[in-house]
Amino acid sequence: MNKSIAPAPVVAAGDVKFGNALPLSVIAGPCQLESRAHALEVAAALQEIGKRLGIGIVYKTSFDKANRTSAASARGIGLDGALPIFAEIRDSIGLPVLTDVHEAGQCARAAEAVDILQIPAFLCRQTDLLLAAAATGRIVNVKKGQFLAPWDMGNVVAKITSAGNPKVLVTERGVSFGYNTLVSDMRALPIMAKTTGAPVIFDATHSVQQPGGKGTSSGGEREFVPVLARAAVAVGVAGVFIETHPDPDHAPSDGPNMVPLRDFESLLRTLMEFDALAKRRSGAGTI
């Protein structure tokens, strides 16, 4: 590894810019890539919402849910099936695309069709995975592990920048608090901004997840997504991560914590108001 360079204070995925002092941007989409038709339906709806509100949106979805609670749970269509769908969303609908990778060998192939490679929280310290993602030259979004202190993310980011890639996002998604429960410590947002120098994202939907809370699957408390999202945006973050679905109660994964697509635009309008107030009062963002 080479000596780390400083992470970029602003990173751009297509026309969507992330910076702690910039207007809020959004990462949104369904938890799992269910089918081409479903993915295009949600992506088109998000593109229209972004256009109406004047807010940048990156489409997210997972080609493989590799850490399901049960081996019997649906995992997704796989990387081979996902790549042409990712490319179609990016090229035809016009949204930048994010997906998560779980193995170093997936990074280069996924980077062919997406703008942002995401490192899952459970894998945030896996050096080989971080270096492989960084080597693609794509933006790398690292979710802070539920077991990790926010100040420890500086070491994680340094692994990525040591590969010569300054394009890093860091995401807060809650910390383990007893069994099957996560809590969100809003102090983590300015701490990660200070210790990493990277744009900070708040994952409002996984933060209300109840890991393994339903026995063979995870539960969630969807009603608290707007509460935590407002709190985080009031701090002055670069972006929010919100999973959304037309029918979350029948989604194959993470339904209990996804926001119904019909409610998504209203939530974004509120968050944009909070963001404008936070950054207007501080002059240049609060973190």
UniProtKB/Swiss-Prot annotation:
A Pfam family that this protein carries is: DAHP_synth_1
GO CC annotation terms, alphabetical: cytoplasm
Keyword annotations for this protein? Cytoplasm, Lipopolysaccharide biosynthesis, Transferase
Give the record's GO biological process terms.
keto-3-deoxy-D-manno-octulosonic acid biosynthetic process
Stated EC number for the protein is: 2.5.1.55
Q: Which domain of life is it from?
A: Bacteria
SUPFAM superfamilies the UniProt entry points to:
Aldolase
* PANTHER family named among the record's database cross-references: PHOSPHO-2-DEHYDRO-3-DEOXYHEPTONATE ALDOLASE
Q: Which family does it belong to?
A: Belongs to the KdsA family.
Q: What is this protein called?
A: 2-dehydro-3-deoxyphosphooctonate aldolase
Give the organism, scientific name: Rhodopseudomonas palustris (strain HaA2)
State the taxonomy lineage.
Bacteria, Pseudomonadati, Pseudomonadota, Alphaproteobacteria, Hyphomicrobiales
